[in-house]
Amino acid sequence: FFSLFSGWRVMAPSNAFDYIGMFNTAMRYEDPVVMIEHGMLYADQDDVPADNMDYYIPYGKANVVREGSDVTVLTYLTGVKNCLQAAEELAAEGISAEVIDLRTLDYTGMDYATIGASVQKTGSVLVVEQSPRSLSLSGRLADEIQERFFDYLDCPVGKVTAPDVPSPVSKKLEEAFIPSL
């Protein structure tokens, strides 16, 4: 939601290591920074350097978490883990998915260099996120990718989002609401 407004720096770490590095980076900015946390990530066990908590994750630098050659999958937060799992299942069917953790979601911080390099390699893009389509980043991101990298695309940019319904409060409805395999 905040990524749709100019002037905000929006960071969305998908793991504890990135959270610490991005938090340290955010503390250096004078601009307003929103750090999006997802409650479903709190239980994850991630490695962080015990001897050095002063590292930085560069603002505006996406992370290619899985190399691939058939489709580029752009995601963030809990989507990273879900998309890595889906990529493993696709690999068993002979489809090679490149998964990119966007990390930074605002317009000025979007890493179009990394996205573009991947699009040129795969020719196909899928944006996966948990937000309802009407409030999602996927529409703006799909438009931008189609404008910037049209000559490299073999098909329109695909989007996987949550349905346009109010966010559920029960665990069972939440599981049905969140895009999954």
Region locations from a protein language model:
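Thiamine diphosphate
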Residues: G39-L181
